[in-house]
């Protein structure tokens, strides 16, 4: 753009802007919202939930652990929390899909439970390092076995 094509513009105060805006949900916040609601006692409503493969996988894991989760719309969830000690052992492995955030946070949640759990993921997640989570948990007394040293 040449100087002759340049136009200067100075914003000026105008009338107040009134309205509503709805921003998309956030994946990281959605994982955490599901987990915190599941560990709370009573019913929680999550609005602004980002529905995607990763967040659906995290919700499915909590359902396998005995938490009732409803989806009245793609952007909301109703979670019937069971409290810190209300999770139930799953007879099957808990599949986190490709959700690294979900798996890492679940490792911490499950380390404090009175039952053993197996977390699995897809091929991509299975290659990612987990030591930055498993080592501190082991230092706090958790018994964690990982595949292929990771």
Model regions and ranges:
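Structural preference for solvent-exposed beta-strand-turn elements
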Residues: 1-150
């Amino acid at each position: 753009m040449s100087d002759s094509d340049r136009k200067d513009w100075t914003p000026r105060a105008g009338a107040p802007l009134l309205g509503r805006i709805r921003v998309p949900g956030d994946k990281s916040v959605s994982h955490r919202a599901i987990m915190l609601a599941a560990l709370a006692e009573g019913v929680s409503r999550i609005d602004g939930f980002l529905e995607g493969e990763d967040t659906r996988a995290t919700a499915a894991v909590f359902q396998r652990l005995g938490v009732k989760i409803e989806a009245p719309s793609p952007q909301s969830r109703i979670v019937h929390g069971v409290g810190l000690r209300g999770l139930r052992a799953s007879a099957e492995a808990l599949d986190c899909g490709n959700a690294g955030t979900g798996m890492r946070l679940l490792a911490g949640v499950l380390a404090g439970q009175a039952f053993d759990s197996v977390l699995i993921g897809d091929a991509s997640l299975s290659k990612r390092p987990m030591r930055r989570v498993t080592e501190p948990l082991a230092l706090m007394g958790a018994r964690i076995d990982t595949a292929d040293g990771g």
